[in-house]
Amino acid sequence: VLDTGKNVPSQRIESLFSLSQFIELVVPIGSERKFVSAIIVPNFDACIAYFDAKGIPYDKSAVVYDNNLGPAPVCVKVGKDFVENEEFKKLIDKEVQTVNKELESYEQIKKYFVVDYKFTEATGEMTPTLKVKRRVVMEKFKEEIDALYK
């Protein structure tokens, strides 16, 4: 519930982002706030394929893969240069705007930030059943979240 009294069900926002090719996970934030913001975890494998197809350079030495998350290695971390790349920012922003078109104005994500690693059980943000540990995420990214509301 926003501080305006409007109720914004995070499941609705999360389910709309589940259709995105380039965004793996979104953690909507809005409780007792003026507007909805979000933490975005990209689908790094899809984003890397996009970068490679477009010939967009990035620091390949900063990319980390995990062989334990499925049948094929999964990208779990990229370098800061990757998430700060202008093409990448446009790509993610386009995905956010696509979802925002499906939402009421008070439900729309007004500000967000993108993390450079995949949330997993090993990094502490996910449960064994792959549910987001919201309290952990809110504590871990407190400064970044507060900055969105300044």
Positions of predicted regions on the chain:
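AMP-binding adenylation
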Residues: 1-150
